[in-house]
Structures are given as C-alpha cells and as structure tokens.
C-alpha cells in the first residue's frame, strides 16, 4: 500500500489494540507524526482541500500518513504492513537524497529523528522497500565515520599476547612452559602486555561494518550517488589501515556506547545495526536477503525537508538559516538577504490546487514574527512553499538567485510563491 491509503486490515477489530494509532516516538515539541492514525470519514471535500496533506477518508479506519516503512499490525506478528511512497520506492534515488542531506552538515542526532529501526522483531518480506533501508543505514554510518576520520581515530590500551625474544609486560607462565620450555625453545618467552594502539575493539567493529557496507553498495547497482559513497568507504578504510577486522559476535554485542565520544557512540550503534541486519555474516548480503527487512519507518516529510536544506545550502551557503526560533514557531528556512521565509510541504502536485488556509496562516505568522525578524521590514516579507514533484535530480537553486523565484506570485495571495523541487529519480536501465 502507499502513503495516505487505508490500512488493508479490519480497523475496527484492532481499535482496542492500537487506539488512536501508531505515533512515532521521540518527537520534538510541536510535532505530531504518525505511522498510521485513526480517521473518521470526511465531509464532502471543498476545492481548496484537494491537495491537503491529510488523506481523503471515504471510510472510517486506520490510514497511513507520509511515513513509509514496514510494521507488524497485529500482536501475534502475522499481519505485515508495508507502506511505500506514492512515487514508488523503486524509482526514487534514496541514496541521492541521503547524500545531499549529509552534505548539508546535518548532525547525526538530527538525522536519527528521520528514521528508526527495530532489529529485535521478526523481519518482514518487503521487496518494494529493498532500495530504501540498507542504503539509508550505510549512508548514515559513513557520514559519522567520516567525521571520526577527520578528528582522528581514538586510541586505547589493547591487550596483546605474543611469543617474544625479550620479556614485555608479564610472562604467561603456563603457556610459556607449554610452548617454549617443554620444546626447549629458550630464546623465546610468551608474554602478555598492553599496547597503546588504534586497534581497539570499537575500531575493529567499525572497520568490519565498513567492509559490510562495501558489499551492500556493490549489490545496490550503479549511480552517481553510489560512486560518491564508495569513494567515502575507500577513504575511511585507508584511515583504518592499522586496525584489524577480526571481531567475534559476542564481542560485537558487548561493546558499550561512549557518552564522551558522541561520534563513536553513533558509529557503534549503526555498525551493530549493519552487522545484525545480515546476521553477522558477509555471505548473507545478497539480493534475495534484501527482500526481507526489519521493522522500520522513515518520515518522508522530514527527509524531504533535509534534502531541500542540502540543496539550498549547496546553492546559497550560510545565507540559509534552518529552524530559526520564533514566537510563532520554527520556520524550515529563513534567508535575511533577501528577506524570505521558506517552508517545505511534502504534498505532491501542490502546483495545481489552492494553498490550505492553515499553511497561509502559518507562513504569514513567520514573516511577521519579531523574534525571527527583529527589525521591522519595509514591506511584506515573501513566503515560499516548496513542494515535491517527479523530475530531473538537478538542484533547481544552483544556477539562480533566490530573488529569481519571487517573480511569479500565487494566483490568490500577495507575496506567496511556490517552488517545485523534484525528488531524484533513478535512471531507467
């Protein structure tokens, strides 16, 4: 099923179990995000609501929102629920979207709000989502590891054991007797000692996950964004040249997270997720295995928002301010030269219908907010709605000034403008 469609199971039978629906965890203040939610049948729809982000409800029940993913609908885990985008997940270049997001300078903790994965529940067969989850985790993981490489790998004291010519650390009496004394090898002594090295358990876990990620991308096909990630993997593996990749499954599970080294904390979580995804065996990274995915969700509205942020930052740099704290809320983007308020709305085909009244009020409030614009403007500040369409994956902002997008106004509203920013589409093979 696709976004905004009715759940294909008997909603009434599960109303006691789900209640109002499945609300996404860990939401920031002011957000109200759902994987699916109970909807009562709508009254007849008026013209200016045709392109609303709310689903058209012809029958009361649970309806999907703009969140895609896989989830078990029943407690016994016999009824899988797989939700895809209206555009078709097999057509969207998610790797391109993820790469643009990370190039915008988004922090790992912010990107973690876009998606969540539950590795403990049984996996769900969802071939239509095979191009989504693995590239997402790999791209997120590589962005974190890239930051670690820039700062330098963490070193620590590592326990070593070796048969040496000179005593180093402590002699392992029993093993030295068995390996050297009984064999009359008096020129050797078996020692246990500590060495300050990059070859720590955490770094070996990360390197192992990098090798797994390399195999994941190899079966993903060819694209410009894929080549960029492969280049990142080669750079990271070079930085881990003095680190081994041998690590046991029980060691992977026992590695503790770091509160001081935040990048390592995120990298360890993601590395454990990648290895768990393929049951800790690199031979399980196959096209057939990709058809089964763990329970997960991706908030497409937030992903699109960060994708647009990456495109804006690529074109206009630090002139674009993200989530400025205002008295009326947090606009997605604000530019002070020229003065513009921009907001993404994940509402496909928005160019044909009227803007919803609540959107007009929301952006009008931002443009008059003294916390956002402390100096009184000489005229009304332009408000821009950014919405998705299918099309070429190029950055529409890159070759234009922001003022150039303000030449065409909304047909019903002064100083309101719309910009279509395409979702990147994979080339037909």
Predicted feature locations:
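Catalytic core segments in nucleotide and nucleic-acid processing enzymes
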Residues: 1-52, 287-429
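Residue(s) in the substrate-gating loop at a strand-loop-helix junction
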Residues: 2-285
